[in-house]
Amino acid sequence: MKLTEIQDPSFLKRMSVSELELFAGDIRRFLIEELATTGGHLAPNLGVVELTLALHREFDSPNDKFVWDVGHQAYVHKILTGRAGQFDTLRQHKGLCGFPKRNESVHDVWETGHSSTSLSAAMGIAVSNELKGNDDRAIAIIGDGALTGGMALEALNHIGAEQQNVIVILNDNEMSIAPNVGAMHQMLGRIRSSRKVRYAQDELETLIKKIPLIGGKLEKGGEKLKEAVKGALVPGMFFEELGFNYYGPVDGHDLTDLIEQLNYVKKEEGPVLLHVITKKGKGYRPAEYDGIGTWHGLGPYKIESGEVIKGKSKAPSYSFTVADTLTKMAREDDKLTLITPAMSVGSKLDCFEKEFPERMFDVGIAEQHAVTFAAGQATQGMKPVVSIYSTFFQRAYDQLVHDVARQNLDVTFTIDRSGLVGADGETHQGVFDIAFMRHVPNIRIVMAKDENELQHLLYSAVKYEGPIAVRFPRGEGIGVPMDETLHEISLDTWDVEREGTDVAIMAFGPQVQDALKIAELLEGDVSVRVINARTIKPLDEKMLNALYAEGIPLVTLEEAVLKGGFGSAVLEHANEQEAFPRVKRFGIPDWYIEHGGVNELLEEIGLLPGQIAEEVRSFVNQGKKQSV
């Protein structure tokens, strides 16, 4: 059967193991060939081919519900549920989503993109099944990296306590994006090296029965002995102690073993955990031997050489600029530390880690812990910097409010991927952080217009004593010359980038360049003043009051949600001053922005410079007509 002819996974039940093994090879070749053109999460999916085949063979989706943690490893699931023909549109505008999507298929029952949510969702599904009186199964597939997340551990505790019918498939590949860290990872390593617990139990019972005369009595009273043996085989028996029936570890690329174990698992009552050992990138050498996470998610590549196809770089990335600046500062300040929740690769932190390993802390997928860990350091006079993606910072909101800002602690947040990120879609767009930070007392929020200003703004932010967030976008800088010496710049004032008399556009970050383009497009018709409003909080009240007094129409521009955003702050300030300027706001509307190219998404919501220019022209002309 051609992969593009698949309608649903029911055909798998008619296939022999040898046929499934050949089919697994077809799927791997398909993924390698398709993603070479589109890019995507290659390594995670190559690692779960056999596991996904076995799951769909032994269970009955969509009656039995598969809940994929994070979701980037669901490509094989998508192929088996009739979407192979859409892979040429993967992660593209209006195309196939790179994560499970409920409106794509009845087989996608849970949408995700952030980690550690699957166990809680699966328990919710299992409870609902029980209340409705059906015997459908809830199966959560979670990686060993995601299992380190606090939410996953909370769910393990609850599922075990309630003895809920949840099947947990632990996909253990020793990596999340990069290699995993922490005590949970070390414990799983000890389990990997042990013998299989269930097999050991069976062998123990057989041996006891064979003991002459007393074998039968020992078998009846041998529970303590069996538990002692299990404890010796698997240190701590962590999952069994939490109330789970533990199976494994099993080779995640051995279909015979997988199918056998899944048959045991689906007959169990109560919570079950099947520990599956997989190889991330299995079947494609560059991905299989990737030790740092390059092949976790990437753009197009050359299949033969494994070379990632990149355009000519015109400037260092914003992430590199931040990491490089922090490394330079750490040479002069031995109190500066750097904390990341498992995003050291994406945020280019290797230069800092290489030079200052003792001051670099990768806490794993644990955003809440990362922020409060930083707060604890700050109470002792250290200068912690938390490097975190905008979308993942959402997970540490209470820690920001309660532990950092309330105590006015000296913690710097470098907010990576601020703004639209494109192909990863609605779960990853960095558009909410301004709105959820702006109303928190004590914290400052800043964003530079380019990579050169970014290094100085970050330098100033770290020097500042108190909580401060430095936002910066994904991708390369704009190619401006970089100053060799760092210096402080104001964290309270804005700059006029271009003079104008008809309208003033206030923008920050990359949107300053957009505002300058808008001014050029309107030149000769509308005289546009462009203001670099790099301090989002606090506002430059002196400049704003001068603008109110002048009576010039105001435009705010932000690649963030309008509700509660920068434009809202300007309106609030004007109201407080009893000033009533004409204000037009541009930003992200009140809906989730899906996946696609950034420019395609900006066009869809009307935020390209040409689109804004026409709106500004109308806004200014309307004001002129009203004043006549």
From Swiss-Prot:
InterPro entries: Dxylulose-5-P_synthase, THDP-binding, Transketo_C/PFOR_II, Transketolase-like_Pyr-bd, Transketolase_BS, Transketolase_C, Transketolase_CS. GO terms for cellular component: cytosol. The gene is dxs. Thiamine diphosphate binds at residues 72, 113-115, 145-146, 173, 284, 367. This is 1-deoxy-D-xylulose-5-phosphate synthase. Disulfide bonds: none annotated. Mg(2+) binds at residues 144, 173. It holds the Pfam family Transket_pyr. GO terms for molecular function: 1-deoxy-D-xylulose-5-phosphate synthase activity; magnesium ion binding; thiamine pyrophosphate binding. It catalyses: D-glyceraldehyde 3-phosphate + pyruvate + H(+) = 1-deoxy-D-xylulose 5-phosphate + CO2. GO terms for biological process: 1-deoxy-D-xylulose 5-phosphate biosynthetic process; isopentenyl diphosphate biosynthetic process, methylerythritol 4-phosphate pathway; terpenoid biosynthetic process; thiamine biosynthetic process. It is an enzyme of class 2 (transferase). HAMAP family: DXP_synth. The keyword Magnesium applies. Keywords: Isoprene biosynthesis, Magnesium, Metal-binding, Thiamine biosynthesis, Thiamine pyrophosphate, Transferase. PROSITE patterns: TRANSKETOLASE_1, TRANSKETOLASE_2. Its EC number is 2.2.1.7. It comes from Exiguobacterium sibiricum (strain DSM 17290 / CCUG 55495 / CIP 109462 / JCM 13490 / 255-15). Binds 1 Mg(2+) ion per subunit. Binds 1 thiamine pyrophosphate per subunit. Homodimer.
